[in-house]
């Protein structure tokens, strides 16, 4: 008997989000225009689901990134995120290396979870997704694992669950420690967002909101039909 047969249907990650593999993303940039402004830092964390159906952070990657040729650099953005693009200790890599590394990690996780496609999870996700997709287009990296426009926005989800849309406030509501001094580091924000997303998904499960009773009954009918064949 395989692992997937031993673990209940709804406790498998591939069945939790309709075949999507969720990946937490955070970026730090030199502006708001994904086509023109530099992508300066990128972090990502994949997720795994235990045999009881609870979500947990898994693998991570983190890159400081060199501005692409001709990129706009907004001084106000650098002041906000505290990034010194001229600091040699950043260890910055090219966009090509960063996007290649990201996609490789995500594709491995997606395959291991037997998911069909990956989906970006981020706080105010449209911003992060736009920069990842723009960098992928600029670099020409093939086999982009992410859905081109679908996303899970933790700001919206936290607004629904806690009435809070700011990351630090949402984390506080979920009793997740948040150090404001480390905020606007892509890796730290990704770690907090991953914990927040996992908390919301797991809390919904604990409250009895998943699996939804209708979907559970439908799955039972499907299983009965498959057994009868």
UniProtKB/Swiss-Prot annotation:
Top-level EC class as recorded in UniProt: hydrolase
Annotated positions binding Mg(2+) 2: 26, 28, 184, 189
Listed cofactors: Mg(2+)
An example Gene Ontology CC term for this record: cytosol
CDD domains: RNaseT
Keywords, alphabetical: Exonuclease, Hydrolase, Magnesium, Metal-binding, Nuclease, tRNA processing
SUPFAM superfamilies to which the protein is assigned, alphabetical: Ribonuclease H-like
SMART domains per the UniProt record, alphabetical: EXOIII
Record domain Exonuclease: where: 23-197
This enzyme's EC code(s): 3.1.13.-
Site (Important for substrate binding and specificity): 32, 80, 127, 149
UniProt keyword Metal-binding present: yes
Residue sites binding Mg(2+) 1 per the record: 26
GO molecular function, one term: nucleic acid binding
Superkingdom, taxonomy of origin: Bacteria
GO BP annotations, alphabetical order: DNA replication proofreading; tRNA processing
Family: Belongs to the RNase T family.
Known partners and oligomeric status: Homodimer.
Name assigned to this protein: Ribonuclease T
């Amino acid at each position: 008997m395989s692992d997937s047969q031993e673990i209940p249907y709804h406790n498998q990650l591939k069945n939790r989000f309709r075949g999507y593999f969720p990946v937490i993303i955070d970026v730090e940039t030199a502006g708001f225009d994904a086509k023109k402004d530099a992508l300066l830092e990128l972090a990502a964390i994949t997720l795994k689901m235990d045999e009881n159906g609870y979500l947990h952070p898994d693998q991570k990657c983190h890159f400081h990134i060199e501005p692409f040729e001709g990129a706009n650099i907004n001084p106000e953005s650098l002041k906000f995120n505290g990034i010194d693009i001229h600091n040699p200790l950043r260890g910055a890599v090219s966009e090509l290396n960063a996007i290649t590394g990201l996609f490789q990690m995500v594709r491995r996780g997606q395959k291991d979870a037997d998911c069909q496609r990956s989906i970006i999870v981020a706080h105010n996700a449209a911003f992060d997704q736009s920069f990842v997709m723009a960098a992928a287009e600029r670099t020409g990296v093939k086999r982009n694992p992410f859905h081109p426009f679908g996303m899970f926005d933790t700001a919206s989800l936290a607004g629904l669950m806690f009435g809070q849309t700011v990351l630090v406030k949402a984390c506080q509501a979920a009793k997740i420690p948040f150090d404001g001094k480390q905020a606007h580091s892509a890796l730290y924000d990704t770690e907090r967002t991953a914990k927040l997303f996992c908390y919301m998904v797991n809390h919904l499960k604990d409250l009895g909101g998943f699996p939804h009773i209708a979907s559970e009954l439908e799955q039972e009918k499907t299983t009965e039909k498959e057994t009868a064949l």
